[in-house]
Amino acid sequence: MKSFLLLFLLFVTFSSALPADQKMENEENMQLAQAYLNQFYSLEIEGSHLVQSKNGSLLDGKIREMQAFFGLTVTGTLDSNTLEIMKTPRCGVPDVGQYGYTLPGWRKYNLTYRIMNYTPDMARADVDEAIQKALEVWSKVTPLTFTKIFKGIADIMIAFRTRVHGRCPRYFDGPLGVLGHAFPPGLGLGGDTHFDEDENWTKDTAGFSLFLVAAHEFGHALGLSHSNDQTALMFPNYVSLDPSKYPLSQDDIDGIQSIYGGLPTTPSKPKGPKIPHACDPDLTFDAITNIRREVMFFKGRHLWRIYHDITDVEFELIASFWPSLPADLQAAYENPRDKILVFKDENFWMIGAYNVLPRYPRSIHILGFPRYVKKIDAAVCDQDTRKTYFFVGIWCWRYDEMTRTMDRGYPQRIVRHFPGIGLRVDAAFQHKGFFYFFRGSKQFEYDIKAKSITRIMRTNTWFQCKEPLNSSLDFHFNQEKAYSGEVETLHHQSLSLLIFGIVHLLNKICSY
């Protein structure tokens, strides 16, 4: 009886603490939202009480503005997706106000830059290389040139700073949060670019890539505003990409060339199309789909074709099957009606019985995508639930193949719905109950029911390629858990074990 009473009191103690904890969490979230919207969306609150009707309606309006910019469901409330965006590391330049449009650029093409100080996180040579490559990202698509100087005033003054710094009207907030900021072309602070020294700067993707953040900030220093295109380098939130890959989207290129124009055109000898090799260790795919008892892997103008029960691999031109389809497809999947849908940009084609159906291509927006979605990165249909997942940037949509409508509650962030696979997906398909997600030269075998990765492999393991010694990627993926939210699960498990231990100890005490 005593042990039961103690257990009851313990339960009441934990239960009574929850409302207070929830209230405190709500207050912290509201303070976070106010600071975020004030910094990036020009929110001006009168007084300190957000519950006032005037301030409340103003806050709701700014939340809606922010949700619309990031492509979230516009509710005006601080839902979990909105808070998650607000907590994501990002650029310190506002999303609205004077930065709402592309700004006038420099009135010259030959610009100078100077690195005022260096971060101790990286070797000086690595910092120099990251800055140089970040500037080259923009010079490769414009007539701009960049020359490094070692003294005097440069057009772009580069510095690593912390918190409140010098004459700069912007400040840093310590680790995470704001990573950097830059000022548009002009006199004084114009072109100046600052990075938060409290961050962990790296030359790869282990911490925050200086190359990627610098390339983004230099976009501002050249006159670009933020983009709501989630694939764009000028998207305000930090997205980890392979630094060896070219980071500009067409949206970035169009923006910078609208200010400075494109590269001068010079006649060049045309090069033949590159033919992909199945056993290339860095092989990536544009799209993958089941097609009855086959799987097709698309790359450029070509496709590989394998059968579920045959080890042979066929390599063909896409045009040899479907002359009307374009090259460089971006997504594909087989629906429950044995139709294949293939996607490129804002269009999709439907294939039945190996023939492209008439009246195609059609717009992806008839499937229920909002107008800001310009392309699909990957798609896969769960044949058990008849639900299709579409991957767009860092988000996934779910489509009901029976009602032919998008499911409510979507889009959701990929890292929350499919923990462990990372931020983006290049291609996907289903095989023997597992999803296979492809990102770069890796593929993730994913248990749908357990919501966990079972294996990580190279992309071309389907092609019977001989693995070089020590090349297996089938390992314990602790780093992938950083994306998965499994830390939260482990926390709850630990809390449960702690409570169980306390109760067990109290029972032993009462028995004496």
UniProtKB/Swiss-Prot annotation:
* Record-listed Ca(2+) 1 binding positions: D121, E199
Q: Motif Cysteine switch: which residue numbers?
A: 89-96
Residues bound to Ca(2+) 3 are D173, G174, V178, D196, E199
Query: What Gene Ontology biological process does one annotation of this record name?
Result: collagen catabolic process
The record places propeptide residues at: 18-98
Q: Keywords of this protein's UniProt record, alphabetized?
A: Calcium, Collagen degradation, Disulfide bond, Endoplasmic reticulum, Glycoprotein, Hydrolase, Metal-binding, Metalloprotease, Protease, Repeat, Signal, Zinc, Zymogen
Q: Where on this chain does Zn(2+) 2 bind?
A: C91, H216, H220, H226
- Which Pfam families does this one have? Hemopexin (PF00045), Peptidase_M10 (PF00413), PG_binding_1 (PF01471)
Give EC number(s), comma-separated: 3.4.24.-
Residue ranges of the Hemopexin repeats are: 276-325, 326-371, 373-421, 422-465
What this protein needs as a cofactor is: Ca(2+); Zn(2+)
UniProt function note: Matrix metalloproteinases degrade protein components of the extracellular matrix such as fibronectin, laminin, gelatins and/or collagens.
The name this protein carries in UniProt is Matrix metalloproteinase-27
Q: From which lineage does this chain's organism come? A: Eukaryota, Metazoa, Chordata, Craniata, Vertebrata
Q: Which gene encodes it?
A: MMP27
